[in-house]
Amino acid sequence: MKKYFAAAALLMMMAACGSAGQDKKLEGTTWKLAKMEAIPAAAVGKEADFFTLEFNAADTMVAGRTNCNRFFGKYELKGKELELKNLGMTRMACPDMQYEDAFVKMLDEVDRFEIKGSELTFFDADKSLAVFKAVEK
């Protein structure tokens, strides 16, 4: 009986360890900006839903929020290549609009992505543009 209990406990621990290090999926995950050169960390972390984005596989739509406005558009995936298309957004005027402008410019420059664990990085060729963290729900 003790052998079975020990074996069951070992299997459960192995299963837990195996799932802990898995990469998040681009689609179906809420991503929050963690680091971008043009936006100070204080502006990024100001509100929980500032500088977030989500990719919806069902309709290949991307949607999110800057520090002021909401945005939406289409995306196309080819392996690790990513193209964001037809982005539109609400047009409220807010303080610190330069951060929103920099964020939207970055979205236009993205041509590929990489996910390691719960971290998403956008690239333009080999240049890292922004790093996002998966939001735990």
Residue ranges: model-predicted function:
Residues 2-6, 17-137:
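Lipid interaction determinants
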Residues 10-11:
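Short, linear, compositionally biased motifs with a strong N-terminal bias
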